[in-house]
């Protein structure tokens, strides 16, 4: 990462307020014009890629505070992409401390339409072995201490979340994995991701409970991330990298940090290849996702009842349907 940072150009986005009549809104000033249609959230190892060119570091502020870190923006296969270290460089944020709203808002600022979440997970099923890759299609939310919406404070919205993963983006990931024929890696192209609070790993009783619910993998980060991405009208899919069998399997050791890191390092190059191939697919065949219009009918509060301060915070999300009054 040191070499990338030394080569990076710094771009700072400053948010200032203007009042176009009915409400205030945020505008960006004095910033490098960055538009990256594809975003990747994961570990810092993901953007240490030889294929990543024209790299710059973009520091953003948001109405929801600072993101986990600066965004690393560059070109993969000629396409602008934005990477973000979910836990910050140096992995200094607990899962419960991740500024999920700021991270997703930052991706929205950068013009991201497709967001890939690369995540370490434990397996809850024997067939999903360590080093395998899972592309889930469902979530179970077991988090307790996290704000899971941009809305509130006078503006009410209810997004549809029955199918929480964008099926087209998930298919791109699955096709990329299958086409690479990675040695020792089996693709599981559907499954249920159980998102727990952490930071402690599961008890045996909890692990077996999640298995009885049909859980495929377990992790600590994809919720509320996926919900917020849907509210921001960003297509979202998960590349789940299996590192362990949690603690339920009688023939395997219980999960440890050492085990997780060891298997993640083994899978880092594979994950980079999958991301590169997925970016190529998206560049060749961009698509409109149901996520891209998730807010169209989701807001219940009449626009003339929007509190000015709340609209100001949400203008990047709401402006498409509720532009500021002239």
From Swiss-Prot:
Keywords linked to the UniProt accession: Glycosyltransferase, Purine salvage, Transferase
Residue numbers marked as site, Important for substrate specificity: 202, 257
A GO CC term attached to the entry: cytosol
GO molecular function per UniProt: S-methyl-5-thioadenosine phosphorylase activity
Keyword flag Disulfide bond: no
Pathway per the UniProt entry: Amino-acid biosynthesis; L-methionine biosynthesis via salvage pathway; S-methyl-5-thio-alpha-D-ribose 1-phosphate from S-methyl-5'-thioadenosine (phosphorylase route): step 1/1
Catalytically driven reaction(s): S-methyl-5'-thioadenosine + phosphate = 5-(methylsulfanyl)-alpha-D-ribose 1-phosphate + adenine
Listed EC numbers: 2.4.2.28
One of the Pfam families matching this protein, by short name: PNP_UDP_1
Binding residue positions for substrate: 220, 244-246
Oligomer status and interactors: Homohexamer. Dimer of a homotrimer.
Biological role: Catalyzes the reversible phosphorylation of S-methyl-5'-thioadenosine (MTA) to adenine and 5-methylthioribose-1-phosphate. Involved in the breakdown of MTA, a major by-product of polyamine biosynthesis. Responsible for the first step in the methionine salvage pathway after MTA has been generated from S-adenosylmethionine. Has broad substrate specificity with 6-aminopurine nucleosides as preferred substrates.
HAMAP family according to UniProt: MTAP
Protein name (database record): S-methyl-5'-thioadenosine phosphorylase
Organism, scientific name: Synechocystis sp. (strain ATCC 27184 / PCC 6803 / Kazusa)
Gene assigned in the entry: mtnP
């Amino acid at each position: 990462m040191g070499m990338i940072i030394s080569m990076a150009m710094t771009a700072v986005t400053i948010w200032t307020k203007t009042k176009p009549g009915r409400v205030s809104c945020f505008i960006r000033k004095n910033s490098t014009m960055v538009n990256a249609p594809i975003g990747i959230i994961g570990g810092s190892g993901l953007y240490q890629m030889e294929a990543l060119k024209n790299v710059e570091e973009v520091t953003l502020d948001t109405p929801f505070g600072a993101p986990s870190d600066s965004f690393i923006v560059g070109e993969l296969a000629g396409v602008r992409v934005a990477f973000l270290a979910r836990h910050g460089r140096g992995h200094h944020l607990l899962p419960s401390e991740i500024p999920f709203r700021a991270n997703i808002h930052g991706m929205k600022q950068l013009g991201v339409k497709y967001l890939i979440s690369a995540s370490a997970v434990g397996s809850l099923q024997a067939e999903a072995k360590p080093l395998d890759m899972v592309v889930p299609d469902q979530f179970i939310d077991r988090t307790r201490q996290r704000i899971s919406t941009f809305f509130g404070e006078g503006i009410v919205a209810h997004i549809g979340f029955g199918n929480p993963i964008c099926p087209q983006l998930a298919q791109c990931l699955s096709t990329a994995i299958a086409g690479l024929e990675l040695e020792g890696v089996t693709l599981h192209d559907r499954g249920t991701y159980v998102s727990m609070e952490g930071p402690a790993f599961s008890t045996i009783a909890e692990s077996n409970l999640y298995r009885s619910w049909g859980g495929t993998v377990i992790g600590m980060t994809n919720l509320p991330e996926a919900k917020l991405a849907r509210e921001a009208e960003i297509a979202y899919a998960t590349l789940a990298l299996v590192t362990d069998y949690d603690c339920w399997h009688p023939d395997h050791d219980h999960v440890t940090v050492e085990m997780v890191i060891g298997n993640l390092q083994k899978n880092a190059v594979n994950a980079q290849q999958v991301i590169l191939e997925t970016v190529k697919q998206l560049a060749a065949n961009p698509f409109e996702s149901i996520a891209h219009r998730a807010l169209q009918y989701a807001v219940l509060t009449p626009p003339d009842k929007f509190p000015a301060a709340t609209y100001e915070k949400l203008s990047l999300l709401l402006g498409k349907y509720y532009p500021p009054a002239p």
